[in-house]
Amino acid sequence: MNIDIKLHKYDLPEDLDLGNIIAVDGEFMGLNVKRDPLCLIQISSGKSDAHIIQLDRSNYNAPNLNKLLSNGKIVKIFHYGRADMAHIKYYLKTETNNILDTKIASKLARSYSDSHSL
C-alpha cells in the first residue's frame, strides 16, 4: 500500500476536499497547553493519504485548517483527543466540532475492560 504524504507549510490548501469523515492528530511539545506549543496537525481521509500541516508558531494563522476543524458537517476522529483539542482551541482559537473519540467509544462499547490504550 502506498501512502500519499503531503507536507503543508502553515495551512491546508483552500481547495482541498477530504470528504465528510477525517482522522485528526496533533503533535505538541508536552501536555501543558500554555507552555508547550502545538507544532503540527496530521489529517487523513482514510484513503491512503496523510496531510501534515506544519503550523506557523509565530502566529498560528491557518484559516483553511480552522474552517475544516470547525465544520460541523465533517466528522473528526481522534483517539484520546482531549489534549489535541485543548491545544487546537488554545493556539488556533477555534472550536473543533462533530468529534468522535475512539477511546471514549471503546470505553462505552467495552465497559467490561480497562484496556482502551493510552
Regions found by a protein language model. Give the residues of each.
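Conserved RNase H-like, two-metal-ion catalytic cores of nucleic-acid enzymes
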Residues: 1-117
